[in-house]
Structure formats: structure tokens, C-alpha cells
């Protein structure tokens, strides 16, 4: 599982910061 505020990216095979964490908006959330 990825940490809070991150999501798993299949492309890069790792957890990345979720842009919602930075106020990016729902389209970024997983």
C-alpha cells in the first residue's frame, strides 16, 4: 500500500505524491 498522500503509479512502478495532497483537484486522486 502507498502512504497517505501518495498513489501507486504503474508506469513508474512506485508510489508517487498525489497531486491532491498539494491541492491539485479530484482528477488527480486515485
Curated annotation (Swiss-Prot):
Q: How is it modified after translation?
A: Contains 3 disulfide bonds.
Q: Where in the cell is it found?
A: Secreted
Q: Which UniProt keywords apply?
A: Disulfide bond, Neurotoxin, Secreted, Toxin
Please tell me where this protein is predominantly located: secreted
* Tissue specificity field: Expressed by the venom duct.
Q: What is known of its domains?
A: The cysteine framework is XVIII (C-C-CC-CC).
Q: What is this protein called?
A: Conotoxin Bt12.1
Amino acid at each position: 500500500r502507498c502512504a497517505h498522500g501518495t498513489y501507486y503509479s504503474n508506469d513508474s512502478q512506485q508510489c508517487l505524491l498525489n497531486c491532491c495532497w498539494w491541492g491539485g483537484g479530484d482528477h488527480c486522486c486515485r
